[in-house]
Amino acid sequence: MYEVKLDAFNGPLDLLLHLIQKYEIDIYDIPMKALTEQYMQYVHAMNQLEINVASEYLVMASELLMIKSKLLLPQTSIEEDIEEDPREDLVGRLIEYQNYKEYTEILNTMKEERDLYFTKHPTDLTHLETNESWDPNQTIDLTELIVAYQRVKNRVELNTPKSVEIKKETFTIQQATAQVTERLKQHESFNFFSLFTFHEPVEQVVTHFLAILEMSKSGIVNIKQTKQFDDIDIIRGVNYSIG
């Protein structure tokens, strides 16, 4: 017995998204019978090959079967108006995962390019200023996090000669994740900007950003902002563990 990832998928949501794209399924109107059958074929194939399927895939299989069963239950017209679509939560998670995946691919491409060299003048973000009201209890989306990342990167560039080749760095996402985790051991939350001295290479800022993005996706951290375009706070998430 040995354990592998199902066809190199990063978890059950990744597998489901692959099936949706492969069979051109409308993500907002998923045919649960067809999708469940395709998903179960993957899991069954792994069992037939005596591969130890990770428990998260089996949990998702149970969830798919439950959703499929609910959709098969007879309902009155009144119940149909009141009851939520049992697919709603799954669709929301798939869309969120799809967005994270797209952003991560873009940022990984940026990092690969910067690992070779990078030359850029500071970017003016004053056009992003606004006087609109802002709810401090609102959970921010990826746009605000990217704006905060851009602010850090610009400050780093201000401390870097305008035309300089930045040599390849060895700072990894694992190291960045370890730094964030260590900071969370000491504090329940901390300011995103406090991770930086603004003298480190731009690649290190990008790597920290990718690490926080992955930790947010995994529920290890939450990201909050008290005022629009203000500092970003990194907070312990529901899946955070001191270890």
UniProtKB/Swiss-Prot annotation:
Q: Which family does it belong to?
A: Belongs to the ScpA family.
Q: List cellular component terms (GO).
A: cytoplasm
Instruction: Report the PANTHER family cross-referenced here.
Output: SEGREGATION AND CONDENSATION PROTEIN A
User: What Pfam families does the record tag this protein with?
Assistant: SMC_ScpA
The job of this chain, per UniProt, is described as: Participates in chromosomal partition during cell division. May act via the formation of a condensin-like complex containing Smc and ScpB that pull DNA away from mid-cell into both cell halves.
Which UniProt keywords are present, listed alphabetically?
Cell cycle, Cell division, Chromosome partition, Cytoplasm
Cite the Gene3D superfamilies for this sequence.
Answer: 6.10.250.2410, Structural maintenance of chromosome 1. Chain E (1.10.10.580)
Transmembrane residues, as ranges?
A: none
Q: What is this protein's gene name?
A: scpA
Q: List the disulfide bonds.
A: none
Subunit text: Component of a cohesin-like complex composed of ScpA, ScpB and the Smc homodimer, in which ScpA and ScpB bind to the head domain of Smc. The presence of the three proteins is required for the association of the complex with DNA.
- HAMAP family, sorted: ScpA
Q: Does the keyword Cell division apply?
A: yes
Name of the protein described by the UniProt record: Segregation and condensation protein A
Q: Which organism is it from?
A: Staphylococcus epidermidis (strain ATCC 35984 / DSM 28319 / BCRC 17069 / CCUG 31568 / BM 3577 / RP62A)
| Location of the protein in the cell | Cytoplasm
Gene Ontology terms describing biological process? cell division; chromosome segregation; DNA replication
